[in-house]
């Protein structure tokens, strides 16, 4: 047994300049692991609690009382004494110890950010002690599947100060032989999109996740630019065949739901013409009307995946969406399920979705995250590994995506080092796999939840 000998947390900054927590773990046999915890802007109400310094002695340290020194203290003074001496390779024991120490359903006592930082650092320390890559430590020797990247090249919603209510417009390079070739294709689309935007007089400033954030007149206009950029790059806007590049959307509908109606508040506030001859001439939708709106988009554009198409409380909206379109399109739950096994069980029983988004900090431990992934995959769902809008140079999710053979990863656009770090890590993993066996990149086939 290799014991944990030291646990230390500190406060650092994330990609948005907000404080976050970094945890270092040391082991008796010389292992070392360090993890930085991400943070979301658009969050589900049922997520585990990210502990901030509001109304504490540290409240005035940082703008908006967003410091995390309370969580840091919880690691150094409460968690560390309890897990020092435990075996670093017994991940579930360490995680369970922290869950019991916290004693609340949503980790509000110690903070999910405190607990997750320790959980991930312990796994990294164990991998380091064994002198193996993290993805090998977590997944064993069998996983060789590289994920299809979902690149958020146009940002909206809570991730950008522009006119778009949908949060993410993504490209998925499917018709390519390797992860590197897929990333090269995405690179061409990204830069051609910038060229087309500039040519049309749009700004090319970027949002939190590195995508462009133009002030479009409609969601359709954003999708039109994506299709044009794919074609301009010499690729096929679609799902199948060589050089196919598909589109995915994260609507983040909870952010434009007022409890009764879905309202495109940002587009409405842009003082658009009521005579506009496109889908966004209507700004308010019932759940049924929004379903029909999505149907029009799916019929017109090569959209293979829609995430959080309805609000987290609108279970009937999700059920109807999945029933009508789930055979041929990926219907992803994020705010709906928040990487929580119990909520996922409900979604499975109701057939509300056919895919779950996985965010480590939504649940707060590596063990619980793996439980959610395995349950989804066992139930025939895909599990998409995801970043958060507040990120760092930490690349844990890249290793996790390969370790669990998720087949898909969401980690932003091709700008901002906090996003690029994950892609660079995946390039290294693919190279590593090819030195031992062949890394697999299967494109459209990752959607085992859809009809062929």
Curated annotation (Swiss-Prot):
One matching Pfam family: Enolase_C
Catalytic activities: (2R)-2-phosphoglycerate = phosphoenolpyruvate + H2O
InterPro entries for this protein: Enolase, Enolase-like_C_sf, Enolase-like_N, Enolase_C, Enolase_CS, Enolase_N
UniProt-annotated location(s): Cytoplasm; Secreted; Cell surface
Active site residues per record: 209, 359
Cofactor(s), by name: Mg(2+)
Cofactor: binding details: Binds a second Mg(2+) ion via substrate during catalysis.
Coiled-coil regions listed: none
Record-listed Mg(2+) binding positions: 250, 307, 334
NCBIfam families: eno
The protein's name: Enolase
Organism from which the protein derives: Mesomycoplasma hyopneumoniae (strain 7448)
